[in-house]
Curated annotation (Swiss-Prot):
Pfam families the record matches: Neur_chan_LBD, Neur_chan_memb
The protein's name: Neuronal acetylcholine receptor subunit alpha-9-I
Region (Disordered): 405-458
KW NAD (keyword) present: no
Organismal lineage: Eukaryota, Metazoa, Chordata, Craniata, Vertebrata
Domain of life: Eukaryota
């Protein structure tokens, strides 16, 4: 029971004291505001300077507009001064030391942001002021400020920015209102980190400026924000794509010319870099200060333009063909002989360890397989062996006769004639050819017959001659001689001594079809030689183009790498 009574008495006493404090605060406010004017500077002597202490707390960096060069910040501004007309004896007011009243009831210094860039004019916030019994007034005011900031984007995205916030009295000179710094720098204890900028300090400096319009000094306090851009976002979204795309320009030289996509690749890369360049240009201020990333894009675009131009030039070389002049001697020595080895440009199946004697030429000299020389010698003897010719060979050489473009088999028709022609030039058989077996039934099948005395004899094997490529140097016949797939008019003999009329082997029987077949082979070989010479000339130009492609590919790789290292290294 006593406890309840005690608690009730304490609560009543607290209520009485609180109501007493409220009555004294109301009485104090009425006494202070009596005959008080907020329009006049609160000093007892008008010649005396009123000191105002300014302290800035940076809460947040809301935005940095590089294009318009405007910095938006969220600040807490604290101003402290002494009002000579707002003092009281705290003992007269029941020990009341502090009251909080609206700021519009008291005089406030007209301290503003000099480099304000806000389009809308806004006055100070009407927050309460804290009034102490000794006349000290503290005014805490939040403010979202937009200040002009000279942005230097030369080192974008590795740039530092120094933005100033200058505060001073707009109408009072230094003899009337003096501004002092509450701290040597801005307060960053409550700073909220920004996703794009890092704040590395906010030093303050007090300046006294003499303007040309006035003879009195005007003090101000300038806070300098040290901002560093967070570059990781721009590295992954602007620099790295550009770096990777720039390496596609040299790879355009490695793309085969026959693919038809070399120029398309260069143009596509150029368009991609143009898009990235526009993205950078839209975010940068239109000034003479070009960022290094912009220079990097321009340099890369220049290199891609040059590589595309060189690609067009090299493709013209690649597709020179037979109509072009032969490759100059200096180009063969410099490009084909030396540069191709340095740049490791070899034909299919070759490498840097292949001996010179084993390397495949641009086009094979013989259209035959590995043992072409041996086969040529054997067939050479087959047709003109020991200067003789068998009559049955003349007929066996043409088991099929061309007639009006159709093939007709005459094997059975000439069978009797073949029997009569056996051993026309002697009955012996060359042992060199008797050992050949399993050949074509028109050329290598042994024939047997009964001779005088009843003994069984073998007719000689058919001997054919293979015309070597070196023996077929002649002039191409006119197209008019070609009818129904063969030659109807006689052709001149080749110019080589092996096939001239004087040295040609004589046949005991006239064989015009045999001679016509030889002439047809000569014409086909001549066409093949001309085609091979044309292909060889085009192949030389193609190899020149391939070596130049490989040379410019490495040159551009080195240039892109060095340019990237120099520009990025200088920017960082």
């Amino acid at each position: 029971m006593k406890t309840v009574v005690l608690l009730t008495w304490i609560s009543c006493w607290i209520d009485v004291c609180t109501s007493a404090q409220g009555r004294y605060a109301q009485k104090l406010l009425n006494d202070l505001m009596e005959n008080y004017s907020s329009a006049l500077r609160p000093v007892e002597d008008t010649d005396k300077t009123l000191n105002v202490t300014l302290q800035i707390t940076l809460s947040q960096i809301k935005d940095m507009d590089e294009r318009n060069q405007v910095l938006t910040t969220y600040l807490w501004i604290r101003q402290t001064w002494f009002d000579a007309y707002l003092k009281w004896d705290k003992e007269e007011y029941d020990g009341l030391e502090v009251i909080r009243i609206p700021s519009n009831l008291v005089w406030r210094p007209d301290i503003v942001l000099y480099n304000k860039a806000d389009e809308e004019a806004s006055g100070p916030a009407d927050t309460n002021v804290v009034l102490r019994y000794n006349g000290e007034i503290t005014w805490d005011m939040p403010a979202i400020t937009k200040s002009s900031c000279v942005v230097d984007v030369s080192y974008f995205p590795f740039d530092w920015q120094w933005c100033n916030l200058t505060f001073g009295s707009w109408t009072y000179n230094g003899n009337q209102v003096d501004i002092a710094m509450g701290m040597d720098s801005g307060d960053l204890s409550d700073f909220v980190e920004n996703v794009e900028w890092e704040c590395h300090g906010m030093p303050a400096v007090r300046n006294v400026i003499m303007y040309g319009c006035c003879s009195d000094p005007y003090p101000d306090i300038t806070y300098t924000l040290h901002l560093k851009r967070r570059s990781l976002f721009y590295i992954f979204n602007l620099l790295l794509p550009c770096f990777l795309i720039s390496f596609l320009a040299p790879l355009g030289f490695y793309l085969p010319a026959d693919s038809g996509e070399k120029v398309s690749l260069g143009v596509t890369v150029l368009l991609a870099l143009t898009v990235f360049q526009l993205m950078v240009a839209e975010s940068m201020p239109p000034s003479e200060s070009v960022p290094y990333i912009g220079k990097y894009y321009i340099a890369t675009m220049t290199m891609i333009t040059a590589s595309t131009s060189l690609t067009i030039f090299i493709m013209n070389i690649h597709f020179c063909g037979a109509e072009a002049k032969p490759v100059p001697h200096w180009a063969k020595v410099l490009i084909i002989d030396y540069m191709s080895k340095i740049l490791f440009v070899y034909e299919v199946g070759e490498n840097c360890t292949t001996p010179e004697s084993e390397r495949t030429p641009l086009y094979s000299e013989e259209p035959m397989s590995g043992n072409s020389a041996l086969a040529r010698n054997h067939y050479h003897d087959d047709l003109y062996h020991d200067g003789g010719c068998y009559q049955d060979d003349c007929h066996r050489l043409r088991p099929y006769q061309y007639g009006n473009g159709h093939l007709q088999n005459h094997h059975s028709t000439h069978q009797n004639h073949l029997d009569n022609c056996r051993y026309a030039n002697g009955g012996h058989r060359d042992d060199h050819y008797s050992n050949r077996s399993n050949q074509n039934h028109h050329s290598n099948r042994s024939q047997t017959s009964k001779g005088e005395g009843g003994e069984e004899k073998r007719e000689p094997l058919r001997h054919y001659h293979h015309i070597g490529r070196e023996e077929l140097d002649y002039q191409a016949p006119p197209p008019g001689n070609l009818q129904n797939g063969g030659l109807n008019e006689p052709l001149p003999y080749p110019k080589e001594k092996h096939l001239n009329p004087a040295s040609a082997p004589a046949c005991s029987c006239p064989c015009p079809h045999h001679k016509q077949v030889v002439y047809n082979i000569q014409y086909i070989a001549n066409c093949f030689r001309e085609q091979r010479a044309t292909c060889a000339k085009g192949a030389e130009w193609k190899k020149v183009a391939k070596v130049m492609d490989r040379f410019f590919m490495w040159i551009f790789f080195i240039m892109v790498f060095l340019m990237s290292i120099l520009i990025i290294g200088k920017a960082t």
